[in-house]
């Protein structure tokens, strides 16, 4: 190949035990994603995680956390630099509902295709969770959902204009 791929240490850690196996006491960056963790460049959280890892940062991923409790994102401790948030490869409302506003029967970005593993408006929910779980740590928002809603926009689901997702999510 023209460019030698960076050496990786296996999958990015998803638990305290996996951090301990690497000899890490803390993360530099924690990425929270609405998708299952798939270590492939077609998944943004994995790709960003690998780029940050190649820069020498210690990166962990929390995939599809339980959004009803902040403990689901606190297992690996407070990250040193920031928390990265993405709803996943697809807008969370499109992942959860059809265009006719019916609940989807499956989710192609969840393990086993099981639906309901991400909340509606996942970027906002995960950002608010990160703010409560890690006070003072910057929250960086990215991904498809955040990109499509970065300015004031019409919300089809609520039939009204909504402000930028950055203000709704209180992201940095």
Placement of each model-derived feature along the sequence:
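Short N-terminal or domain-adjacent regulatory/targeting segments
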Residues: 1-23
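Acidic/glycine-enriched edge-of-secondary-structure segments
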Residues: 1-6, 55-58, 108-118
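Short secondary-structure capping/turn segments at boundaries of alpha-helices and beta-strands
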Residues: 16-19, 49, 70-72
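Conserved beta-strand elements of the Class I
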Residues: 28-30
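Conserved glycine-rich "GG(E/T)P / GGGxP" loop and the immediately following alpha-helix
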Residues: 33-39
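Glycine-rich beta-alpha loop elements in corrinoid/cobalamin-binding modules
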Residues: 36, 44, 63-172
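Short helix-loop-beta junction
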Residues: 47-59
